[in-house]
Amino acid sequence: MPNTSSESLPRDLAEDVVKEVNRDQVKIAAVQISGYDKGDERREGYDAADELIPYIGRAGEDEAQLVVFPEYILGHIKVPSSSTEKIATAAAKHSIYVIVGCWEVYNDDTFANTALFFDRDGKIMGKYYKTHAAVDHYEGTPAWSRPPSDKSREWFLKNDPEWIMNRGNDLPVFEFDFGRVGILTCYDGWFPEPFQVLSLKGAELIVWINGRGGSVEDFIMKTAMFQSHVAMVTANQAYGSGTMIGDPSKWPTRILARCPDKSEAYISATIDLRRIRKIRSTSRNFQERRPELYGKAVEPMSNNGPCNS
């Protein structure tokens, strides 16, 4: 599974906009919008990328450095494709980073739940593959140990695609020109360890993209910001809610902007990376860690569950 794409746009596409990089005060935008969902097939004549382009332009005019879109939203696509080329063109035009989710389809018809990172020149600078599968159906003991055995590939694609997706095996941190960024996708954020690992790898900002009904949990976001000293951005599809931007430098943490309703919305806010870096460099939490006590957290769980091993 490739990690990066060499596809990029001609430099002159980005010549109209040249942004001065401020590594201390960084404006971030997030968009709550619906496109393709978890089990959706491609619809002829519909490209969800077309829905995103105006928001990339709005974020650029808003002088944001990064704009974040939800999980799944581009649907099942090859990378690169006409959809990614549209995003790349808009990113280059407005000299802005873009993070957006899709089902990335490979030549052998396998696929992954992928977050694409576009840099200011429109190049796909990296990818993140969802690591924890949010499956809905199972059989066997213990629970969730294996998928239903009597279902076809077509059934899984429509009803429970994460059973058969290629799962990621890494929690990478990406170097942006304003700072270090990690990413998680939906169910990944229900585990405390990924937030901690990304922070310990140097992430100053964690992006958490979602595609689900209900609201993204602000208590998870606040806990992660407080314990791991990272800023956070969440983005959800518009049939849900809870798109947020948060800053841990406001004691104990603060949600700077949010979308509380199930509707299409755009938010932006400025995070204080200078202060976050200072907090990270002087954190008692980091200095007083006792990793020799935490081994149980990374041991596989026995078939009898965590309390009976």
Please tell me what each predicted stretch does.
Residues 10, 106-201, 210, 219-223, ...:
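Active-site catalytic loop in hydrolytic enzyme cores
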Residues 30-37, 59-80, 209:
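Short, conserved active-site loops that position catalytic residues or coordinate cofactors/metal ions
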